[in-house]
Every structure is written in C-alpha cells, then in structure tokens.
C-alpha cells in the first residue's frame, strides 16, 4: 500500500520536475534504500519520456506564435524588400539624375558660361551693331550723294565755263584743224607749181599734165573744206571753225577777190549748197 500511495505523488513530482527542471535530471530519495531507488529512476524516466512526448505533441498540434510571427515578419520583409527594390532603384536613378544634372550645371557654370556670355555678348553686339550698321550705311549713302552732287556741280561749272568761252581743245576741233591744214598744204603746193611756171616756163606736155592734176586736186580740197564747214556748222558755230579763203598763186587778197581762182567757183557752189541744206 505504501508503494501504491507513493506512486501518484511520484508521478506528479516527475511531471513537475519534467516541466520545471531541465531534462536528464535524476530524482533520488535519500530516506529509502538503494533497492527503492532503481524503480523510482525507471518510473521517472518513463514519466519524463511521456511528458516530453506530450509536450512535443502539444507543440506540433498547437501553432507556435513565435514562428508565425517570424514567418509574417519574413514575408513582410520580403514584400518590403520587393517593393523597396524598385523604389530604391528609382530613388537611385533620381539621385543619379540629380547628380548628373548638378554636374552638368556645374560644368555649364564652369566651362559653358563663357560660351553663354559670348553668345549673349554677340547678341548684344548684333543688336547694337544693327543701328551702327544702319548709321554706317546712311553715312556711306550720304557720302555717295555728296560725291554725286559735287560731280554734278563740277560738271555744271564746266558747262558754264564752256558757255562763257573758257574751253579746252576737243576732238572735233582737232579734226577740223587737221583737215583744214591738209587742204591748205595741197593748195600751197599747187600755188608753188604755178609760181615756178612764171619764172621758168614749162613745156606744153607738162602744162597739160599739170592742168589734169589741178582739177581733181582742187575738187578734193574743196570737199575737205566743205566737210570742215559742215562739221563746224552742224555743231554750234565758233570763230575758229570759219574756213579761211585760200590765197591764189602770186596774188593778194584783193586781186583774188577781183579775179577768182579757177577752182574757187566750185567752192562757192558747194558752200552755197551746204548752206541751203542747213
């Protein structure tokens, strides 16, 4: 009976020991003998094994809140990491963009500022140069107008000087004088031939040849004189353009007027026709 009464206490004590004390702790009673210690040890081991199995079953049947909490935290952490990865990547990209923009702005301020200043200065210069350029164009136009006005005034002065009589020799004057000089030279040659005939008379053949030459030569001289007079009278007449009368061979001006030269009649007829035309 003593053993039967002690069994429930031992069982309870073994359960308490299994729950309170760490495993593999032996229970011994010093009051009883060595023979009683062995069954108590075996019973304690069996009770401890039963209690550990029950504890394991309870742990398996009952959910562990710590594990669930740890799993939830892991899932949340995974979701947070999964959600934070794109956020972090976007944040990094934004940071990189900001850094790049700040670097670019620094470079622009450091290196490109002179270019901007140059462009601004060029724009300012172009804006300021447009009125300057316009003023320069106006000045050049004014200078051209002044030069033209001066040239016009110079030309008008020349025309006035010509009208007053102060005139330089022109091409027309040189042509007329040259033609008159040639005709006079030809006529003088003819006059010299007639003078020689007086001092040393020629033969009849020489006189006939001289008379043959004299007619066309006098005609040419008269045409030259007529051309000179036409050139003189088509344009405004001047004193130097009036043809002078040719002197006869061995005759004065009065004798020539009384006895005209044989070819002089032709000149008068030609000049009269020219005057009629004019």
From Swiss-Prot:
The entry's keywords: Nucleus
Record's keyword annotation contains Nucleus: yes
UniProt-annotated stretches for the region Disordered: 1-137, 251-278
Positions with biased composition (Polar residues): 13-31, 78-92, 120-137
InterPro entries referenced in this protein's UniProt entry, alphabetically: FRG2 (IPR026245)
Coarse class of the protein's main subcellular location: nucleus
Bias (Basic and acidic residues): 1-10, 32-56
Keyword Amino-acid biosynthesis: no
Subcellular localization(s) per the UniProt record: Nucleus
GO cellular component: nucleus
Similarity section: Belongs to the FRG2 family.
Protein name per Swiss-Prot or TrEMBL: Protein FRG2-like-1
Taxonomic source organism: Homo sapiens
């Amino acid at each position: 009976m003593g053993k039967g009464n002690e069994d429930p206490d031992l069982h309870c004590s073994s359960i308490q020991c299994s729950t309170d004390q760490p495993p593999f702790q032996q229970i011994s009673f010093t009051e009883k003998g060595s023979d009683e210690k062995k069954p108590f040890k075996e019973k304690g081991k069996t009770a401890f094994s039963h209690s550990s199995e029950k504890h394991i079953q309870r742990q398996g049947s009952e959910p562990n809140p710590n594990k669930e909490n740890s799993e939830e935290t892991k899932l949340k952490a995974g979701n947070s990491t999964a959600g934070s990865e794109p956020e972090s990547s976007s944040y990094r990209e934004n940071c990189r963009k900001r850094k790049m923009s700040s670097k670019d702005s620094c470079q622009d301020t450091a290196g490109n500022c002179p270019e901007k200043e140059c462009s601004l200065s060029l724009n300012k210069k172009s804006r300021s140069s447009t009125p300057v350029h316009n003023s320069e164009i106006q000045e050049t136009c004014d200078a051209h107008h002044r030069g033209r006005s001066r040239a016009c005034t110079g030309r008008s002065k020349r025309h006035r000087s010509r009208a007053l009589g102060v005139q330089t020799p022109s091409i027309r004057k040189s042509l007329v004088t040259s033609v008159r000089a040639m005709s006079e030279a030809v006529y003088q040659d003819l006059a010299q031939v007639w003078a020689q005939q007086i001092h040393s008379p020629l033969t009849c053949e020489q006189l006939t040849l001289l008379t043959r030459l004299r007619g066309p030569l006098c005609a040419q001289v008269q045409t030259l004189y007529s051309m000179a007079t036409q050139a003189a009278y088509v344009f405004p007449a001047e004193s130097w353009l009036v043809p002078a009368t040719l002197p006869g061979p061995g005759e004065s001006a009065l004798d020539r007027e009384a006895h005209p030269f044989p070819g002089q009649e032709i000149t008068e007829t030609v000049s009269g026709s020219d005057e009629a035309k004019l």
